């Protein structure tokens, strides 16, 4: 059926693109094709545990937190409130794009309500995974789970907090709490490096920070076309995936509502991406896994390795 692009302004909706399997379905390729049709590309969940591979001007790029419309100067790229951000990884990703001549600052906006991943979140992730032994869930060790735990536990730091003169005090309070928790893991050695993280936070302050829920709805009222870009896949949804071997956010289309601040009746087309065969990284049930030479051949010829972790 024809795509809904010329509808009346009052009926403008947010289209959603997401994976229907366990991630690595090829969402980046589809986003690359769809991006020219939209004015705004918005991430609504996940963080640097995601990896979208796309090709621009003949060069392959892997984006982890930044939306996939960043290579198009006329497209606004929004990191929504449902996303968790590691300032260090975020800065490195932006620096790499700037080196390629991309005007990231001119086309990127970050929600003040997005939560920050602290260095101690990554340490807690590693300590928790190590303590599980054979029962580990296959975490990417990016600190995603502990960050969402602090979010729901109402302890987290948000991007908007970096604008406060009391930010460093609040950071050290949460950091010290994490250090006390890390001390409870037997035999886990760690060292907290604050300097690089705080430097990356200072860089984050130079970027455009917005109240994304208001900006999204203003864009809709202005008749702008918006694509919500999902990460991971449906089978990794925190509620409806193969729990507990899942991610820590809602990867389904409804996640776009809470992750961007839009009403359910504002969701338009939903593009579900899947490939001819399933793949999965990490732990968890995988009923159709091929564990012989054929499986190895499919993995090799299909380059089936996680875009973020490189895991087969």
Tell me the role of every PLM-derived stretch:
Residues 12-312:
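Non-transmembrane, aqueous-exposed alpha-helical and coiled segments at domain scale
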């Amino acid at each position: 059926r024809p795509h809904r692009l010329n509808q009346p302004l009052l009926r403008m909706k947010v289209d959603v693109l997401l994976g229907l399997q366990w991630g690595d379905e090829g969402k980046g390729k589809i986003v690359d094709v769809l991006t020219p049709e939209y004015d705004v590309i918005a991430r609504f969940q996940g963080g640097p545990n995601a990896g979208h591979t796309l090709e621009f001007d003949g060069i392959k790029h892997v984006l982890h937190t930044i939306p996939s419309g960043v290579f198009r100067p006329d497209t606004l790229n929004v990191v929504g409130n449902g996303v968790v951000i590691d300032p260090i990884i975020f800065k490195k990703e932006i620096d790499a794009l700037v080196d390629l001549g991309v005007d990231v600052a001119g086309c990127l906006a970050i929600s003040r309500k997005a939560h920050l991943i602290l260095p101690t979140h990554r340490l807690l992730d590693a300590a928790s995974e190590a303590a599980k032994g054979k029962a580990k869930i296959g975490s990417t060790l990016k600190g995603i789970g502990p960050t969402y735990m602090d979010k729901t536990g109402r302890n987290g730091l948000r991007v908007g907090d970096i604008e406060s003169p009391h930010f460093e005090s609040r950071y050290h309070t949460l950091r010290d709490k994490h250090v006390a928790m890390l001390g409870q893991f037997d035999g886990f050695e760690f060292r907290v490096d604050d300097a690089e993280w705080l430097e990356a936070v200072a860089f984050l302050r130079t970027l455009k920070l917005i109240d994304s829920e208001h900006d999204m709805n203003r864009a809709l009222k202005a008749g702008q076309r918006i694509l919500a870009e999902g990460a991971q896949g449906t089978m990794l949804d925190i509620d409806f995936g193969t729990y507990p071997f899942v991610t820590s956010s809602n990867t389904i289309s409804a996640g776009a509502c809470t992750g961007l601040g839009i009403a359910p009746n504002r969701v338009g087309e939903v593009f579900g991406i899947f490939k001819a065969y399933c793949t999965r990284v990490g732990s968890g049930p995988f009923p159709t896994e091929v564990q012989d030479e054929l499986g190895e051949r499919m993995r090799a010829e299909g380059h089936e390795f996680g875009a973020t972790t490189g895991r087969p």
